[in-house]
A protein has these predicted regions:
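Membrane-proximal amphipathic alpha-helices
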Residues: 38-49
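N-terminal signal-anchor/signal peptide hydrophobic helix marking the start
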Residues: 10-20
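Surface-exposed intrinsically disordered loops and tails
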Residues: 91-101, 109-132
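N-terminal leader/signal peptides at the extreme start of proteins
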Residues: 1-10
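Short, surface-exposed interaction loops/tails
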Residues: 122-159
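C-terminal juxtamembrane segment of a hydrophobic transmembrane alpha-helix
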Residues: 22-40
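Post-signal/leader-peptide non-cytosolic segments of secretory proteins
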Residues: 68, 91-103, 137-143
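Alpha-helix exit/C-cap motif
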Residues: 54-86
Length: 159
């Protein structure tokens, strides 16, 4: 009689192969996660920019007789911001040809419009942006995005 050897289970090669594949998947997720988080924070900053732009439009509608908004009057029209503290990081800049924007603030300049071309990414924080002249009811809302991590990108929205 012949004795059959019917052992059940996995060989060491099969176990090592499964662990190697799982390790590769884990490494890919681990590498991609920071970029995904940066992208989500940047999208949230863009949404905050739109929220502030809508607040400026609401202020303009409520104050048809003119005048200029201040930080305090603008904050009344902003419910909440995701990436910024509206009481300390929402700032109205003094009108001028350019302004600097740090990564922890959202800045508004009255009477200006965004430049026609997007400023090049840089490692500067704060970064400077030169704005175009606009009417008294125009405003430019500017934030500094993380972009790819090593370089920052200015994002500007006209009102």
């Amino acid at each position: 009689m012949t004795k059959k050897d019917n052992k059940k289970g996995f060989t060491i090669i099969e176990v090592v192969l499964v662990l190697a594949i799982a390790g590769l998947i884990f490494a890919m997720v681990f590498i991609a996660l920071p970029a995904l988080q940066r992208s989500q924070r940047d999208q949230s900053r863009k949404n905050d920019t739109s929220t502030v732009a809508a607040a400026i439009n609401n202020w303009n509608s409520a104050n048809r007789n003119g005048g200029t908004f201040s930080e305090e009057s603008l904050r009344k029209y902003v419910d909440k911001l995701d990436q910024y503290d509206k009481s300390s990081e929402l700032k109205v800049a003094t009108p001028g040809a350019s302004m600097s924007v740090a990564s922890n603030e959202i800045k508004v300049m009255r009477g200006k419009k965004c430049p026609s071309s997007t400023p090049a990414p840089s490692a500067d924080d704060p970064a400077n942006i030169t704005l175009q002249n606009g009417s008294s009811r125009n405003a430019a809302v500017v934030v500094l995005l993380e972009n790819n991590g090593s370089q920052k990108q200015l994002y500007c929205q006209d009102v």
